Regions:
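Glycine-rich phosphate-binding active-site loops on the catalytic face of alpha/beta enzymes
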Residues: 48-53, 121-123, 128, 171-180, ...
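Catalytic cores of alpha/beta
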Residues: 31-37, 155-163, 215-231
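Glycine-rich beta-to-alpha transition loops that act as phosphate-gripper elements at the mouths
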Residues: 22-27, 96-105, 128-129, 150-154, ...
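N-terminal amphipathic alpha-helix/helix-capping segment at the start of soluble metabolic enzymes
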Residues: 1-20, 83
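Active-site-adjacent beta->alpha loops and helix N-cap segments on the catalytic face
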Residues: 1-4, 53-62, 71-81, 103-108, ...
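Alpha/beta catalytic cores of nucleotide-metabolism and tRNA/nucleoside-modifying enzymes
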Residues: 194-207, 216-289
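Hydrophobic faces of well-ordered beta-strands that scaffold small-molecule active sites
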Residues: 17-21, 46-48, 93-97, 122-124, ...
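Alpha-helix-loop-beta-strand connector modules within alpha/beta enzyme cores
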Residues: 59-94, 138-147, 151, 188-206, ...
Length: 289
């Protein structure tokens, strides 16, 4: 489902917009309203975040929201409600979760429940393909997409293994450290996308490469959309919620970002762009949104 939605965006001469929001901030109902608002503003795919007590790869903005959800006892059943809401709103829902909550819930059980709720798959930022046997088997059985991450520090062997194991898209993390919005979009992301596409071609698949981390406005979205198949935005959406702008703020941000990915243009989507040349280089190895 995810690959088809990105295919559809590319047929329109643009990258896909992928929004991330966690369930449970400021409460479950308000977070689901905001998630749906992201779709109404133009998001093609929504990453629905699972609250976790030790989100080591998340920056302070996302951690602040997730901490509230964890203290309130928000869990995977609430996440599945959000999945249903996104599917009903016409976007493609994927869950983004650290691996521990999925193991505790039961890998096969979660795969079944996610599929039944209309979910397309899952992004697992702290799970590498080598250690994902149970999830690979469960996702094969249910037809769910499984999205693994690569970073500028990834070796060619790691890129190849990730390209071979992923389904839906490959998540290219453009900077190192924890997640959060950036003032500029560095050129490390473009280099990583090119390397990942080479790995995908070598293993004989046709996966898309989507870039996460750092984008906070439509202009930055246009920069990333010039060389990526999808633009992933997380912290900027969460900031709208933390600052009290709620669903209306999320909807407006989505509209700005959606306009940005459309500005990149079909010709730039076809090949790597040099539009970010000269901007400060990103650090190496960050994962998240």
């Amino acid at each position: 489902m995810v690959q088809q939605r990105i295919d559809s965006a590319r047929s329109e001469g643009r990258a896909a917009l992928i929004a991330y929001l966690p369930v449970g901030y400021p409460d479950v109902d308000a977070s689901i309203e905001a998630i749906v608002a992201a779709v109404e503003g133009g998001a093609d795919v929504v990453e629905i975040g699972v609250p976790y007590s030790d989100p080591g790869m998340d920056g302070p903005v996302i951690q602040q929201a997730v901490d509230v959800a964890v203290r309130a006892g928000v869990g995977l059943r609430d996440v599945l409600r959000a999945v249903e809401a996104v599917a009903a709103a016409g976007a493609v829902p994927v869950v983004m979760s650290y691996w521990n909550p999925i193991e505790r819930y039961g890998v096969d059980r979660f795969a079944d429940d996610l599929s039944a709720a209309g979910g397309a798959g899952m992004i697992t930022p702290d799970l590498i393909p080598d250690e994902a046997g149970a999830w690979l088997a469960a996702s094969d059985r249910t037809g769910l997409d499984r999205v693994f991450l690569v970073a500028p520090s990834s070796t060619d062997a790691r890129l190849a293994a990730t390209a071979a194991a992923s389904r839906g898209f490959v998540y290219a993390a453009s900077t190192m450290g924890v997640t959060g919005t950036r003032a500029t979009v560095g050129d490390a992301a473009e280099r990583l996308v090119a390397r990942t596409r080479e790995a995908i071609a070598d293993v004989g698949t046709d996966l898309h490469v989507c870039v996460g981390l750092g984008v906070s406005n439509g202009d930055q979205a246009a920069e990333v959309a010039a060389f990526a198949d999808g633009v992933i935005v997380g912290s900027a959406y969460v900031r709208e919620m933390l600052d009290g702008r709620g669903a209306d703020g999320v909807r407006a941000l989505s509209a700005d970002l959606a306009a940005g990915v459309r500005r990149a243009g079909a010709s730039e989507l076809a090949s790597s762009s040099s539009r970010t040349a000269g901007l400060p280089s990103a650090s190496v190895g960050e994962v998240g949104a």
